[in-house]
Amino acid sequence: MAGKVRSLVWTGDSLRLIDQTKLPAVFEFVECRRWQEVSDAIRTMKVRGAPAIGAAAAYGVVLGAMECRGETSERLIAAVAAVIKELAQTRPTAVNLFWALERMENILKAQEGKPAAAVIEALRLEAEAVAAEDVKACRAIGTNGASLIKNGDGVLTICNAGALATVDYGTALGVIRAAFVQGTKFHVYAAETRPFLQGARLTAWELVEEGIPAILICDNMAGWLMQQGRVQLVIVGADRIAANGDTANKIGTYTFAVLAHHHGIPFYVAAPLSTIDISLDSGREIPIEERAAEEVTHLLGHRIAPEGIGVYNPAFDVTPAHLIAGIITEVGIIEPPYRENLAEALKKR
């Protein structure tokens, strides 16, 4: 899929998104012509993955501005500022969303007094830059991390940190793609990732599309595979990385990190620098999104749990930095001590 079809495409007057809720059964695009449709797509996970929702939100701002093209510059800027605030409420954990919206807000503030058409064009150019930079970063992440995968390795990953989770190519799957293209002989264990099944539906689909040898497993099989010596490396994505290296990612990631540590298996995070939130001292400060009970009690529209049962459904967990061997970024692999090295890496952005 990578390089062939992007997860999101700007058409000039709309944002086309792959509807990730329908994969792998149906490959279908959602056409967003209003910012509210982008907001809904992010909330309902038609588009998901930290870098992808950041880029989608940036284009959502452009759509919000285009809806006000007949207004005065002053009114347009006020309306777009309100749109940015609304888009920031869609999902709380992925920092790329807020990073992209902050960029759009900075551009908006710089347009004061300029004609409405100029404001819209400046916002469009910034959204295009956000998307282009993500593609470039993911390609570099793949290149920088590919050598970690050796011939004969079993590589475990969770959720979907591939082309679908970014504008194109992917973070954790970007590393896997790059190693595969370089000719390394290995196979991937894709954890299904309950309850939303991003691993089974999305990662497995990407791997099959690319022809990368892969095996789908249930999440609770990971420890047994490690004990049997079938896993030599774990690579995951990230939704937010605190200043000390603590990393929020899809629920279940922390479990894999603990298991990997117990079995002496290197555990790596792959993420662009935009995922690093230096304003948060540690993972304790990362807000964790809780999603609807129906994601746990229902499967493909059918109830699988009894009525009346309580449900706890956090979308993310936090892996402590001491369990992470390295963070693969577009400027290289960052290793401990994370507080100093992450701050230094951000200077290269």
Stretches with model-predicted labels:
Residues 96-155, 186, 190-234:
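Ligand-binding beta-strand-loop-alpha-helix segment within the catalytic cores
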Residues 185-186, 191-349:
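Conserved phosphate- and dinucleotide-binding cores of soluble alpha/beta proteins
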Residues 31, 35-38, 50, 54, ...:
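Generic structural signal for well-ordered, non-membrane alpha-helical segments
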Residues 30-46, 78, 147-155, 298-308:
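Short, hydrophobic/aliphatic alpha-helical segments
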Residues 18, 56, 60, 98-100, ...:
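Short beta-strand segments
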Residues 170-181, 257:
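Histidine-anchored nucleotide/phosphate-binding helix
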